[in-house]
């Protein structure tokens, strides 16, 4: 089942489960306390948009109702949501109405920012954050109302963030290029003009929109420039992994697959989804996974296995779904020993748990339980093979999914968390993982390059190497996918720079890969998927078809590695 379909029909647990285990790797008994929910509503804060754009729009993302979200809404998220001072989304009563973006209940959080999809013509119809220049917003007193100019708030927040990055980068020896400086200067000048006419909402909004246009471009350009600056002053990173999944193996000629795969990649992930890998409990079907593994290792490709545990409906057979929690723990220990020992030292890493923070939780496990499952798997994997790396894989860094779950009590009882919060929980609980994994599909971040890397940087503080475990974007429609109805032609403004095509897919890949490669705390980037039509993102493969037709993005990966080496210090 697709994630967008799952979101429509799934719901979260409303109560905790007390558990016990006889395993050699016991976990603590878990109880979820009953809670009394307080009234946290205060005065109303309204962010009023001024639609100064020239096109037909839409220019501000909105949904009719959180109760009626459908597939098209999930494919192109457009709802507003609030975030805290650590940029973690949280449930609130924020909603876009005809009057603007309204919020009056932040669930007790004193300071917050808002996140909206806003159309900056010439750049994109994309998610961005207003956070009052990093000082954040507070709700008015009960019974009061305050109205802010949305255009102005977005502009001054983005300009402030750019200033912060520029100051940081200059301290590290970088200087903006002649090409970049006009974007920075114009964003500042237009914002200064907007401040001078702040009492004239229309004029302020127009000037703010111009500032926002230049600041969005400046934000991306300065991140890319700084990346190339860092690449040039450091040695080439021979140990950096460029990888991809192997789902195309067996769906195209295997010799052709191996040739094209190993020409581009030195890292591979082999999936072990239970419906095909373990349709019946304790009966393992390794199938061509062993063949893939052997061929890849012979070619010198480093391999990761994934996942040991994933509670999504797509990958949870009935025999596992029907287990008690204590029996799930016993199964997890047994399963971990089996797969880790099967491949031995030749397997570089195992993804111990996948997407445990989000709504794909058909087993209705609580965050604390998922943390304990991760801890158990990490301990058992290490006990089975101390040499294997242990990776936690998270998705949806934007965490907009937090807002679309309507039961307020669910959120107040903290039964869903962001990826950043889940890693923090694992770290604080002593989960013995060695790699932090984060997915960065464009269609699931819906953020520009600057926001994407800043969000990812929050993971540095946990002190683990970071892998971009899954990354990708579409190459746009093809004649076949349009005629078949699998890919609908857009009826809204483009989301990033222009409409997606093969060249834009390659441009996005080149820019975000360069930024990520330049960060010494990131050890790998893995594109998903290799070949269409088997890609998770529609038309998101590097090969256009199983016959091996190469897209521009495939060529760009190979050229990019050569360019990094050429520009490096040594």
What residue spans do the PLM features occupy?
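Substrate-binding cleft and catalytic face of glycoside hydrolase catalytic domains
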Residues: 269-279, 290-366, 371-399, 478-479
């Amino acid at each position: 089942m697709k994630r967008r379909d799952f979101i429509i029909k799934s719901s979260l647990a409303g109560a905790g489960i007390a558990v016990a285990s006889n395993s050699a790797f016991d976990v603590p008994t878990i109880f979820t306390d009953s809670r009394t929910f307080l009234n946290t509503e205060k005065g109303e804060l309204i962010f009023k948009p001024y639609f100064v754009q020239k096109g037909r729009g839409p220019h501000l993302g909105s949904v009719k109702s959180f109760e009626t979200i459908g597939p098209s809404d999930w494919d192109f998220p457009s709802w507003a949501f609030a975030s805290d001072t650590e940029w973690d989304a949280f449930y609130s009563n924020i909603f876009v109405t005809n009057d603007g973006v309204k919020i009056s209940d932040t669930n007790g959080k004193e300071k917050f920012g808002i996140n909206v999809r806003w159309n900056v013509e010439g750049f994109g119809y994309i998610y961005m954050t207003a956070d009052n220049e990093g000082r954040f917003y507070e709700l008015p007193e009960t019974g009061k109302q305050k109205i802010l100019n949305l255009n102005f708030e977005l502009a001054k927040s983005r300009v402030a963030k750019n200033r912060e990055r520029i100051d940081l980068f200059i301290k590290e020896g970088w200087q903006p290029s002649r090409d970049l400086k006009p974007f920075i200067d114009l964003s500042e000048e237009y914002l200064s003009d907007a401040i001078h006419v702040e009492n004239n909402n229309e004029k302020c909004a127009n000037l703010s929109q111009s500032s926002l246009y230049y600041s969005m471009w400046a934000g991306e350009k300065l991140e890319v420039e700084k990346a190339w600056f860092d690449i040039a002053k450091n040695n080439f990173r021979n140990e950096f992994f460029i990888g991809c999944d192997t789902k195309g193996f067996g769906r195209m000629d295997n010799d052709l697959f191996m040739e094209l795969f190993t020409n581009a990649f030195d890292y591979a992930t082999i999936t072990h989804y239970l419906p095909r890998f373990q349709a019946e409990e304790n009966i393992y079907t390794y199938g061509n996974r062993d063949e893939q593994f052997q061929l890849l290792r012979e070619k010198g490709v480093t391999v990761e296995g994934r996942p040991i545990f994933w509670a999504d409906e797509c990958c949870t057979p009935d025999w596992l779904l029907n287990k008690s929690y204590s029996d799930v723990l016993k199964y997890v220990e047994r399963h971990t020993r089996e797969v880790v020992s099967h491949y031995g030292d030749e397997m570089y890493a195992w993804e111990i748990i996948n997407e445990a923070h989000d709504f794909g939780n058909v087993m209705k496990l609580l965050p604390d339980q998922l943390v304990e499952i991760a801890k158990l798997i990490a301990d058992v994997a290490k006990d089975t093979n101390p040499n294997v790396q242990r990776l936690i894989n998270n998705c949806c860094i934007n965490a907009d999914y937090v807002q679309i779950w309507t039961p307020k009590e669910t959120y107040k009882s903290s039964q869903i968390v962001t990826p950043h919060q889940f890693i923090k929980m694992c770290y604080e609980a002593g989960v013995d993982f060695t790699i932090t994994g984060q997915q960065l599909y464009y269609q699931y971040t819906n953020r520009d390059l600057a926001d994407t890397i800043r969000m990812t940087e929050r993971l540095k503080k946990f002190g683990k190497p970071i892998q971009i475990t899954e990354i990708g974007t579409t190459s746009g429609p093809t004649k076949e996918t349009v005629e078949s109805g699998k890919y609908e032609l857009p009826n809204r403004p483009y989301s990033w720079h222009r409409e997606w095509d093969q060249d834009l897919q390659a441009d996005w890949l080149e820019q975000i890969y360069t930024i990520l490669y330049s960060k010494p705390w990131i050890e790998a980037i893995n594109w998903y998927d290799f070949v269409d039509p088997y890609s998770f993102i529609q038309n998101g493969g590097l090969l256009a078809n199983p016959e091996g037709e190469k897209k521009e993005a495939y060529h760009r990966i190979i050229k990019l590695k050569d360019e990094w080496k050429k520009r490096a210090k040594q």
